[in-house]
Amino acid sequence: TQNGATLPGTVGIGHTRWATHGAPSDLNAHPHFNKDHSIVVVHNGIIENYLKLKKKLMSKGYEFLSETDTEVIAHMLDYYYNGDPLATITKVMHRMEGSYALGILFRDYPDEVYAVRKDSPLIVGTSKSGNLIASDVPAVLKYTRDVYFLENEEIVKLTRDGLHFYNIDEEELEKEATHIDWDMNAAEKGGYEHFMLKEMHEQPKAVKDTLTPRIKNGDVVIEELGMTDEEIRAIRKIFIVACGSAYHTGVTSKYIFEKLARIPVEVDLASEFRYRDPILPENTLVVIVSQSGETADTLAALRLAKEKGVRTLGIVNVVGSSIAREADNVMYLSLIHISEPT
């Protein structure tokens, strides 16, 4: 609604974003437009070469109203627009550096929404009443339990008739939806003032829910490791890599691993791990921890570990997330229950 009035229409995009470029202001707020408002964009991420692109556009006569990198995307789409949204989007993707999840509207195609993903999470929810895009699953659970996870450099076109997926080469893709069977309370505050307080009070239950299904006949059985007893005993070092509160969990885990298993453990902030050129000897296990499975620095750390040829284990909540797909093995926390792809 706007000032208490219901807005007409069945297509729309919006985004609340940290002010990474420019001060918080109406001019810098999303969505952003080209000059005649025929192209509209919302953006989660950072365009690293936006100043170079902005300089080029200004030399072509484009004027900017905001200080954001997102407005550059709107004008880039305008510059390359030839009447074909998909071709225009891929041209712009080839010229942008950085991470982005985009929602795009074209006035010429009023019943379509285009969404793009590169190194920033993006999911598509689908139901009989409509289709939605969001950065994470909890945002759509109120409306649907069936979601698609976009891979890197994939594009989706949402229409009244359904969903169409493409890669950056404009080739149409077949994708499977995943049915999310979560306890809705896990995605709500549950009466707490904020999520941090809720998570603190839920820790005992979360630990119990995670461990109970993996204790059988007095033994701890973690089948998700995908390792034989001999391979587990051969591990000589463990790295735990994470960001935010997941990092603090890693620090606590270090004490437990070293006390019980007598294996040396290093805990790294993912943003540091990927740049410090870590020494990863043979028989090392790198444990990647991320609630969403999409944390950019953590995902980059996973890819670095795989490049160096060491075994990786992802610990995440979200099935189908990038870390879940790319790690050698994945362990889902039992606090949330997720079904397999349908």
Q: Each predicted region: which residue ranges?
A:
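Residue-level detector of conserved catalytic or cofactor/ligand-binding positions
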Residues: 334-342
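Generic structural signal for residues in well-ordered beta-strands
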Residues: 64, 265-267, 330
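Conserved short alpha-helical segments that host acidic/polar catalytic motifs at enzyme active sites
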Residues: 1-193, 205-236
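Anionic-ligand anchoring segments at beta-strand to alpha-helix junctions in alpha/beta enzyme folds, i.e.
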Residues: 121-122, 132-134, 204-221, 229-286, ...
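Anion (oxyanion) recognition and catalysis
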Residues: 58, 306, 324
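Surface-exposed amphipathic alpha-helices with a cationic face
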Residues: 299-306
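Acidic-glycine-rich active-site phosphate/pyrophosphate-binding loop
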Residues: 323-332
